[in-house]
């Protein structure tokens, strides 16, 4: 099964299985050298390409504990070949709505070919539901390869390589997806955690463009905004100390091996992929006017589970200032709490402070601009282990539906996929003036005034009274050494 494109000047041979066609490892850009801007490919020089094998992922360490049974898939890594994408479509697709997915992983790790992101069940169910969707997954540069700021030949600091890759991929999709049966006028882009943060970053980037030039219109943001990741100058985000630390360890950062660079970034303290305030973003990026048309905004009640290993007995907090005392009061934390109770309450706090606060900020901005927002609370617990609660990224189990789990959980997954495909089709997944609450195998449509029944509104209001920078300083002592958990 193949696609021969005159406009792309190439032939792409894919896989056809059980009514689904898959094209893997399509390069959307060339990366000429380390820390170079990706160069979009629009002409494939009359080549014939084997798209039956998984594409390369960006080299990465795995400093995370994964909240998924299947775990990170062993992948071939190549920093110069990771600018690729995978297209999954119904057989014979023509003019279908497109759903693009940006994977998470803290901008340090992850890949779209990982078995937990397999889109085949999603696409199959979209056919059954009568809303067939063409799905695209994108790879992009990660960790130091994607988010280290480096000085150029003029001494100016440049970065955001991974974010620029993501935008280049979206440009390729907008321009060329019609060759694979997608409708370029109906593209929805989604992401979870760092994927959602990245999508927010791309929306900020497009705020600098005239609306007619924008390619991001319909978005699904799940548990991640730029709010606490932010952008910064060299000193504010500590890029230069990290750069200097890596350079001290490896010598020439441009010619050292990928493995040497990865080992050095850990020792130098690069534990998340931050954004650089350069020409990719407007100076006042927190107060832009978004150009998107429709938004589905979602989070999870215990989004703070990705801090669970960083909240440890060695950093148990004793209230010392007004901020601490207020946090303890708002989350009903006591110095007499058992470790289990303290740990759970701190995860609630970190989830609010890191993720849900940002969603609340974005929702207010969207509403001020009359951009419709479908607000969702995804509080469905882990499908196989209730003790893991409704943790950060738990919605991915139900989005992709490719794990072994009880049939009632598969039913929840199918209903959730219905919700998402309706949004992708430009339909209302639920009334836009209502709240969508997913819990205990139920999909409830509630009045938005009931938001406070399921989220800590007094705490969110308190946290919104501080800037992200202030929160960064005030909450440093609340977490310690340890891996993030995805």
From Swiss-Prot:
Taxonomic lineage: Eukaryota, Fungi, Dikarya, Ascomycota, Saccharomycotina
The protein's enzyme class: hydrolase
A GO BP entry: lipid catabolic process
Disulphide-bonded residues: 58-82
This protein's encoding gene: LIP1
Domain of life, per lineage: Eukaryota
UniProt organism field: Yarrowia lipolytica (strain CLIB 122 / E 150) (Yeast)
This protein's name: Lipase 1
PANTHER family: CARBOXYLIC ESTER HYDROLASE (PTHR43142:SF1)
Positions of the catalytic residues: 193 (acyl-ester intermediate), 303 (charge relay system), 392 (charge relay system)
A Pfam family hit: COesterase
One GO molecular-function entry: triacylglycerol lipase activity
EC number(s) reported in the record: 3.1.1.3
Sugar-bearing residue positions: 332
Family matches, as InterPro entries: AB_hydrolase_fold, CarbesteraseB, Carboxylesterase_B_AS
Reaction catalysis annotation: a triacylglycerol + H2O = a diacylglycerol + a fatty acid + H(+)
Keywords in alphabetical order: Disulfide bond, Glycoprotein, Hydrolase, Lipid degradation, Lipid metabolism, Signal
Family (UniProt): Belongs to the type-B carboxylesterase/lipase family.
């Amino acid at each position: 099964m193949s696609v021969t494109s005159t406009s792309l000047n190439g032939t792409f041979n894919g896989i056809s299985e059980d009514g689904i066609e898959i094209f893997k490892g399509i390069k959307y850009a060339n990366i000429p050298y380390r820390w170079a801007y990706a160069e979009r490919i629009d002409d494939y020089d009359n080549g014939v390409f084997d798209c039956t094998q998984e594409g390369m992922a960006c080299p990465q360490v795995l400093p995370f504990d994964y909240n998924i049974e299947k775990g990170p898939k062993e992948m071939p890594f190549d920093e110069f070949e990771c600018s690729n994408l995978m297209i999954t479509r119904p057989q014979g697709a023509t003019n279908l709505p497109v759903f693009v997915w940006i994977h998470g992983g803290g901008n340090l790790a992850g890949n779209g070919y990982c078995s937990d992101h397999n889109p085949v069940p999603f696409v199959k169910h979209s056919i059954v539901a009568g809303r067939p969707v063409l799905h695209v997954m994108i790879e992009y540069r990660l960790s130091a390869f994607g988010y280290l700021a480096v000085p150029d030949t003029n001494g100016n600091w440049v970065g955001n390589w991974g974010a620029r890759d993501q935008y280049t991929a979206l440009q390729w999709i907008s321009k060329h997806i019609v060759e694979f049966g997608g409708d370029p006028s109906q593209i929805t882009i989604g992401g979870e955690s760092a994927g959602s943060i990245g999508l927010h970053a791309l929306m900020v980037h497009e705020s600098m463009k005239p609306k007619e030039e924008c390619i991001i219109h319909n978005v699904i943001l799940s548990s991640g905004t730029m709010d606490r990741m932010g952008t910064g100058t060299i000193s504010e985000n500590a890029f230069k100390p990290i750069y200097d630390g890596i350079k001290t360890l490896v010598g020439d950062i441009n010619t050292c091996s990928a493995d040497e660079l990865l080992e050095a970034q850990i020792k130098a303290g690069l534990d998340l992929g931050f954004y650089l305030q350069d020409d990719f973003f407007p100076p006042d990026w927190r107060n832009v006017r978004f150009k998107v048309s429709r938004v589905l905004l979602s989070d999870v009640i215990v989004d703070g589970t990705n801090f669970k290993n960083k909240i440890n007995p060695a950093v148990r907090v004793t209230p010392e200032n007004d901020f601490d005392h207020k946090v303890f009061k708002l989350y009903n934390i006591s110095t007499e709490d058992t470790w289990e109770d303290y740990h759970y309450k701190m995860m609630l706090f970190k989830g609010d402070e890191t993720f849900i606060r940002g969603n609340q900020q974005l929702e207010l901005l969207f509403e001020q601009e009359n951009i419709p927002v479908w607000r969702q609370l995804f509080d469905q617990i882990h499908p196989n282990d209730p003790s893991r609660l409704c943790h950060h990224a738990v919605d991915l189990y139900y989005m992709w539906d490719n794990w072994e789990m009880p049939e009632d959980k598969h039913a929840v997954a199918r209903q959730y996929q219905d919700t998402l495909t309706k949004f992708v089709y430009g339909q209302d997944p639920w009334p836009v003036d209502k709240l969508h609450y997913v819990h205990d195998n139920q999909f409830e449509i509630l009045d938005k005034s009931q938001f406070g029944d399921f989220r800590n509104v007094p705490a969110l209001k308190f946290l919104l009274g501080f800037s992200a920078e202030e929160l960064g300083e005030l909450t440093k002592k609340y977490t310690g050494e340890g891996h993030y958990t995805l």
